[in-house]
UniProtKB/Swiss-Prot annotation:
Record-linked PANTHER family: FMN_FAD EXPORTER YEEO-RELATED, MULTIDRUG RESISTANCE PROTEIN NORM-RELATED
Keywords, sorted A to Z: Antiport, Cell membrane, Ion transport, Membrane, Transmembrane, Transmembrane helix, Transport
Listed name of the protein: Probable multidrug resistance protein NorM
Listed GO CC annotations: plasma membrane
């Protein structure tokens, strides 16, 4: 990160940060995409099982990665204030925090997942695949969270290209392990859909090993003296949790509502479950665009706010939101035109493809809503405003999606589509609430700046 003097320099810096994050996010979401697509080609029953498993996994995993992502604004503020010597200490505290959170998530997966999956009305075969998938996936919890901390460090330092290069390794690693374990190639035991969970875990262990080597060999990081182990500092841990818990909670509130919808849909046939999850899976892949802008906004805004250059932060906000709209125009057009081709990536059954196309059409609307809402979350994180957005997210997602879904399900014959309508309206409401909060925060900082003149 560095100080910029004009709009052109800001645009160049923003795009330099944004594009590597975008490629990184695509690679990150590709793990779930590869698991779902390759399992769908195996058979529909296993796809339904993996779909149910990811509905449980995603909220808790994103909650914990959201907590450790608090490292980005913390380091951003240090750099903006010229306190680079504080970076290593915060990095190690988040490593310790990630290890503790890994143990919590591991226990939840091993003990709670089977109870939930066996009591929501799933067919026995589908539930069995889901449980085995989660058990295999739990092997990779530690490297998943530790890599998230390393990535947050690199991103906050502006080394987003390095994060991108590391994450690009995930797709070939995950695809290779999945091919061996799902289909039983080259004498490896055929595990079906559950093998996708083990494939993802193995891929992340390899990725973590490579990341640690890079961390200590990268010339630009040697000035941080990361080789010096820093002991546990509970005050810094508490600061990280204080800032990270609302971030994780906000992400959890959004992701969990999608997952709850997926679990409620257990009452439908395996075909509908598989079609719903396939459409949702590809929509998650497309979410990489607004999510990347959100991450980039958190980096640049936190840096400028830390340096007390509030007008520069405001300029970046405008750049980020326009970038989101431009990319949305391209991605939504692409999905609308090629939604039939997208559906065929997940299976060959004509009924399955037709149903998935319908779900993908609904997904266009909540992807548009995400274009407005997601960048606002990153901007608010850049201002270190996380608590109020958490409650706004709870209100917007949970206070709207479920009641609207229930209303449409009871009064219309929309069936499974009622769930998607509820999600779309909840995203629109959440985006409006985040925009209101940003207006309040920006006025507060502008008043603070004027009072010090």
């Amino acid at each position: 990160m560095y100080k910029t003097k004009c709009l052109r320099e800001k645009l160049v810096l923003f795009l330099k940060i944004f594009f590597p994050i975008l490629i990184y996010q695509f690679a990150n979401y590709s793990a779930s995409f590869v698991d779902t697509a390759m399992t769908g080609q195996y058979n529909t029953m296993d796809l339904a099982g993996v779909s149910m498993a990811t509905s449980i996994w995603n909220p808790f995993f994103t909650f914990l990665t959201g907590i450790v992502s608090a490292l980005v604004p913390i380091i951003g503020h240090h750099l903006g204030r010229g306190k680079k010597e504080e970076v290593a200490s915060d990095f190690y505290q988040f490593i310790y925090l990630a290890l503790g959170l890994s143990v919590v998530l591991l226990g939840m997966v091993l003990f709670l997942a089977p109870i939930i999956l066996n009591h929501i009305g799933l067919e026995a075969a589908v539930a069995a695949v889901a449980v085995r998938y989660l058990w295999f996936l739990s092997i990779g919890i530690i490297p998943l969270l530790l890599f998230s901390v390393i990535r947050s460090l690199l991103d906050s330092l502006g080394l987003t290209k390095l994060s991108m290069y590391l994450m690009l390794l995930l797709l070939p690693l995950n695809s290779g392990f999945n091919y061996l374990l799902i289909y039983g190639a080259f004498g490896v035991p055929e595990l079906g859909g559950a093998g996708a969970g083990l494939g993802t875990s193995l891929a992340y262990w390899v990725l973590l090993g490579i990341s640690v080597l890079v961390l200590f060999k990268q010339e630009k990081l040697k000035a941080l003296h990361l080789e010096k182990r820093i002991p546990l500092n509970m005050d810094k841990i508490k600061e990280g949790v204080r800032l990270g818990l609302p971030i994780g909670g906000t992400v959890f509130a959004e992701v969990a509502i999608f997952s709850v919808v997926g679990l409620i849909m257990a009452k439908f046939s395996p075909l509908i479950i598989a079609s719903h999850q396939s459409a949702m899976n590809f929509s998650s892949l497309m979410y990489a665009f607004p999510m990347s802008i959100s991450s980039a906004m958190a980096i640049v805004v936190s840096y400028e706010v830390g340096a007390k250059r509030f007008d520069d932060a405001k300029t970046y906000i405008g750049l980020g939101r326009w970038t989101a709209l431009i990319f949305a125009a391209f991605t939504l057009t692409f999905l609308y035109i090629f939604r039939g081709n997208v559906a065929s990536l997940y299976g060959n059954d004509p009924k399955f493809i037709d149903l998935t196309v319908r779900f993908l059409t609904y997904s266009l609307f909540f992807q548009l809503a995400d274009t407005f809402a997601a960048p606002l979350q990153g901007i608010l994180r850049g201002y270190k405003d996380t608590v109020i957005p958490f409650y706004l997210g709870l209100l917007g997602y949970w206070g709207v999606a479920i009641p609207v879904r229930t209303l449409f399900d009871s009064l219309t014959d929309f069936g499974a589509y009622s769930y998607w309508i509820g999600l779309i309206i909840s995203l629109i409401v959440s985006g409006a609430l985040y925009r209101w909060r940003l207006t309040v925060i920006m006025k507060r900082f502008e008043s603070l700046a004027k009072s010090k003149c």
